[in-house]
Amino acid sequence: MSSREIRIATRKSALALWQAEYVKARLEQAHPGLLVTLVPMVSRGDKLLDSPLSKIGGKGLFVKELETALLENNADIAVHSMKDVPMDFPQGLGLFCICEREDPRDAFVSNTFASLDQLPAGSIVGTSSLRRQAQLLARRPDLQIRFLRGNVNTRLAKLDAGEYDAIILAAAGLIRLGFEDRITSAISVDDSLPAGGQGAVGIECRSVDAEIHALLAPLHHEDTAVRVIAERSLNKHLNGGCQVPIACYAVLEGDDVWLRGLVGDPSGSVLLHADARAPQTSAQALGVQVAEALLEQGAADILKAVYGEANNE
């Protein structure tokens, strides 16, 4: 096995490269002598920075180019933020490893105010996420939400330049890039339910590569995987992607998993909630159950309107 080489397809953003380097280090630690190299590339989502994700539309904005590299044998594995990974994979590819989850919460970042509750009426908050926007405006309808895209450094620079009073980012990304001190306050999952898979890193590879699967096995974290399976099952049943106002978060309680789901109107006028518990072995069915409970409350109408707006742009 010492002569084996693994090529990691990764986006070129600082956070994506951190994740790829993390996987590289874990593989080298688990398999001394293994040669691991990075194959950096630019995704469609990285190029289209002048529009909100909800307006670009489509799924797999941050993964398609990496999957093409796998299919054309230009890479052996692809490392993804799980919240960016579509529910379905191209034929011949699959998700074979989910690493231990980092902090899944959203982070409130401001140079002036200590928390979301302390923001004065009319304050400008930056985010490109309809999920965050819906929950923010439901709690604070007096805030102004302003579009914010770009990598973590770019977003922090825009805050520091005074374009925003505060911005909302994933806590995991800030922690991984060494910006933990920029987190003014972490937002409780009760106040801002995360995106499915937020904070977790997943590894995709070719389904037939049994040798690669074996090399990845030491990196797999089963507790995280069970939680992410439940969350992704909910997302899939709602036909969700990373650009729609769907939130879901699972935690383990003994042998059970508790899944909370949310669908929100981007205006904050309506937030639909549902939750349920099931044995960990039924995580996938649990996702469908909670998704169905949201659909019974009218989630399809909210999501149809969001998709309609994206298609009309």
UniProtKB/Swiss-Prot annotation:
<dbReference type="InterPro" id="IPR022418">
    <property type="entry name" value="Porphobilinogen_deaminase_C"/>
</dbReference>
<dbReference type="InterPro" id="IPR000860">
    <property type="entry name" value="HemC"/>
</dbReference>
<dbReference type="Pfam" id="PF03900">
    <property type="entry name" value="Porphobil_deamC"/>
</dbReference>
<protein>
    <recommendedName>
        <fullName>Porphobilinogen deaminase</fullName>
        <ecNumber>2.5.1.61</ecNumber>
    </recommendedName>
</protein>
<dbReference type="InterPro" id="IPR036803">
    <property type="entry name" value="Porphobilinogen_deaminase_C_sf"/>
</dbReference>
<dbReference type="InterPro" id="IPR022419">
    <property type="entry name" value="Porphobilin_deaminase_cofac_BS"/>
</dbReference>
<comment type="function">
    <text>Tetrapolymerization of the monopyrrole PBG into the hydroxymethylbilane pre-uroporphyrinogen in several discrete steps.</text>
</comment>
<comment type="subunit">
    <text>Monomer.</text>
</comment>
<dbReference type="GO" id="GO:0006782">
    <property type="term" value="P:protoporphyrinogen IX biosynthetic process"/>
</dbReference>
<comment type="similarity">
    <text>Belongs to the HMBS family.</text>
</comment>
<dbReference type="GO" id="GO:0004418">
    <property type="term" value="F:hydroxymethylbilane synthase activity"/>
</dbReference>
<feature type="modified residue" description="S-(dipyrrolylmethanemethyl)cysteine">
    <location>
        <position position="242"/>
    </location>
</feature>
<comment type="pathway">
    <text>Porphyrin-containing compound metabolism; protoporphyrin-IX biosynthesis; coproporphyrinogen-III from 5-aminolevulinate: step 2/4.</text>
</comment>
<keyword id="KW-0808">Transferase</keyword>
<keyword id="KW-0627">Porphyrin biosynthesis</keyword>
<dbReference type="Pfam" id="PF01379">
    <property type="entry name" value="Porphobil_deam"/>
</dbReference>
<dbReference type="GO" id="GO:0005737">
    <property type="term" value="C:cytoplasm"/>
</dbReference>
<dbReference type="InterPro" id="IPR022417">
    <property type="entry name" value="Porphobilin_deaminase_N"/>
</dbReference>
